[in-house]
Amino acid sequence: MQYHRIPHSSLEVSTLGLGTMTFGEQNSEADAHAQLDYAVAQGINLIDVAEMYPVPPRPETQGLTETYVGNWLAKHGSREKLIIASKVSGPSRNNDKGIRPDQALDRKNIREALHDSLKRLQTDYLDLYQVHWPQRPTNCFGKLGYSWTDSAPAVSLLDTLDALAEYQRAGKIRYIGVSNETAFGVMRYLHLADKHDLPRIVTIQNPYSLLNRSFEVGLAEVSQYEGVELLAYSCLGFGTLTGKYLNGAKPAGARNTLFSRFTRYSGEQTQKAVAAYVDIARRHGLDPAQMALAFVRRQPFVASTLLGATTMDQLKTNIESLHLELSEDVLAEIEAVHQVYTYPAP
């Protein structure tokens, strides 16, 4: 395994991290513990969870992911060797009730969310606590176009950052990060930290893959000059980049087979792009998933590539991508496809 020091922090993360959003839905607790055992044995030290997980979110399963990981941590006994990252949910974006009646990113809700996450995870602190998505209405989760609004968010970024700072001072959070953020949001957090002597955010967790390279426009430059590096998620586009959904295939137990609401990676242009990328991989004797993950890992703004798997075979294949370095010929062919199918699944 390779490791990377995140700027402006003492966090040294494995360049592959373990994503967990299937724990409690597609994966049982026994499955989850087996994945954790294997990942850690391979040198992975970054485990990413969220109070909302598993996905798709349901009241009856909310928090199970953290519970499963917490039970494993209690049994494993090496908490200090691991980097545990969790997330506080923002306001509901689907007009449902959310986790709490008033799911604003204010002091009250952050206090409650953090308390519950620590309890489920059976730990006294989090190495990284991330704002899962912004309080304000903005572009994330595949939203296209920008909806102009004259109203200010009910809770300002300063209020959110000040609340997070309180729990950092209390020793319950080591570092702060954001997720599903924009260049404006990242720069605003950094400006407020400097102006008010508050802790700066050290990471951003956004989607990044061959199907969604929008991070390269704006946020990559912020990452380079401000040192806020990417924890890349959805690097296989819900498994789409493996090619398993091509030609209308619906593999039993696969995420897009089970949950038809997830259409982000199902569009016609996306399928054409996937077919082209899979063709590149096969012509060069590469596993399509490993090629896609190796492309993400090689980007200079990526601190860690988060892996998601529902089977041990998938996890093993994904971790093996660590040993793959893409040739100049492969990279040139990838860029040629990107020129034709640019951001088919933002």
From Swiss-Prot:
Belongs to the aldo/keto reductase family. Aldo/keto reductase 2 subfamily. CDD domains: AKR_Tas-like. Keywords: NADP, Oxidoreductase. It comes from Escherichia coli (strain K12). GO terms for biological process: cellular response to amino acid starvation. NADP(+) binds at S234, C235, L236, G237, F238, G239, T240, L241, T242, G243, K244. Pfam families: Aldo_ket_red. The active site is at Y53. One of its GO terms (cellular component) is cytosol. This is Protein tas. InterPro entries: AKR, AKR_Detox_Biosynth, NADP_OxRdtase_dom, NADP_OxRdtase_dom_sf. One of its GO terms (molecular function) is aldo-keto reductase (NADPH) activity.
